[in-house]
């Protein structure tokens, strides 16, 4: 995206030129649980066009939440960026986020991807997708998450460890959609089908599917997109090319999100940055290089186009937070290690 286009976006969100030119000592401090160099470029361009310096601190989501709790009102954080509904909902429940009253931000973010109380707002979308090694199983035989619990997949399924927040949110999603009893039976069915020990990460799970150690797996879509695009090297690119990604119908969609810290000292600057990041141009700027989906639309990369479109299920991000704790209990009681 050219700087002139970004400047138009900043003007559209109401940043007065007199207050955005370099030389004005304005800044916004961001605590980010996202770890992408491409995010830094988006912040840099924002600073160049507004004169608002972005000071960035990166750590895991859990670490950042604990830091905010420890710092209290003395925190220097203005914005917190987190991945997954569980983390952003947790930050809100802990009273770490301040509501933002902005009609523009609400217009930017569909209701299902923002907090009903305006404490956080989605920036990008990620699908918890199913991947298949077509040499071991017919991809057309799997269309929904429910299919992962079918007995004919016994010894063929690979899953990430229970402590992973992405799978916790997937189970929470199914509790909302299908009810606790059905979700419990589904989890038990998947655990019975597991082949390998539970994996520590999506990347290693994808490699196992490519190597034929697993026939089926569950991963966030962008991990496979990056590997197929060559982002992790030629060997991974070659290994993963045959893997087929299935968008379950309907699909569990999660987000990365931003909220203004309750302790924010630079509120106007924080709102300006969040307004931009949630705008069509801002969301696309963050999502594009990481192969995530913007808030609206399905991206422009060849990898995402090859995955096809998806139909999100009817569960809102805030609903996931309400069932997360029960999801973890069900996973533990069902033998998901």
Predicted regions and their residues:
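Sec/Tat signal peptide C-region and signal peptidase I cleavage site
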Residues: 19-25
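Early extracytoplasmic/lumenal segment of secretory-pathway proteins
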Residues: 25-90, 337
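Extracytoplasmic ligand-binding site segments that recognize negatively charged/polar headgroups
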Residues: 33, 37, 59, 76-213, ...
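Periplasmic-binding protein-like
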Residues: 126, 155-163, 187-191, 196-199, 237-262, 276-300
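An extracytoplasmic/periplasmic, membrane-proximal ligand-sensing/linker region
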Residues: 181-183, 292-337
